[in-house]
């Protein structure tokens, strides 16, 4: 191609956000449930409505914004080796990864969503990301937030949580098993068990 007539393929394909403020950068008080659900479906995170979502920002040594969804149903390939966990990762308004696996632990591989931090550099590679200290800090905060959100759901909306657990509970159990119990302390309160008369699911604290 010439300088006068450049071809699109000469440019690095990066997705830059348009001029409208993206949903995760907006104040959650200005957003409706419909806004969140529409974004979830527009991004093809799922066809139905999510069970719930968490929208937050962290300000500290590392700053970031996140919008994370708990799906209602597992995708068709969820239990196959083809399934890829991870959250979309943005920095400075540019998507640098479509699925950043290092942001969520295996126990929460079902979550969908977006994270943006301007503390990351634009030209960071997948290999560099795995070693990035700031990304590890972000990941730790995200997993803590997801765990707390699920515990709140269990406490405040037990029926909704029971539906979630029937869909994804095996994944949490597997994460405890595969870590040889190393993360049992963090995850055991999320587990549900059938009561003695097996008519309903209850938590370990209720058991």
Please tell me what each predicted stretch does.
Residues 1-207:
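Conserved GHKL (Bergerat-fold) ATPase module
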């Amino acid at each position: 191609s010439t300088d006068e007539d450049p071809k699109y393929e000469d440019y690095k394909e990066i997705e830059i956000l348009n001029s409208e403020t993206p949903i995760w950068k907006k104040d959650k008080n200005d957003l409706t449930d419909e806004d969140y659900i529409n974004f979830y479906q527009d991004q093809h995170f799922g066809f139905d409505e999510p069970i719930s979502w968490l929208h937050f920002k962290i300000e500290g040594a590392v700053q970031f914004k996140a919008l994370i969804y708990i799906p209602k149903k597992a995708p068709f390939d969820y239990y196959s080796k083809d399934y890829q966990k991870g959250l979309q990762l943005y920095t400075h308004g540019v998507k640098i990864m479509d699925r950043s696996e290092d942001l969520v632990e295996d126990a929460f591989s079902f979550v969908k969503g977006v994270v943006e931090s301007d503390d990351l550099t634009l030209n960071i590679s997948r290999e560099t990301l795995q070693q990035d200290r700031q990304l590890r800090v972000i990941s730790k905060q995200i997993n803590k937030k997801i765990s707390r959100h699920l515990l709140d759901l269990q406490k405040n909306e037990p029926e909704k949580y029971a539906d979630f657990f029937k869909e994804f509970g095996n994944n949490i159990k597997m994460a405890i098993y595969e870590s040889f119990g190393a993360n049992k302390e963090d995850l055991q309160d999320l587990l549900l068990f059938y009561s003695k008369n097996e008519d309903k699911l209850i938590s370990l604290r209720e058991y």
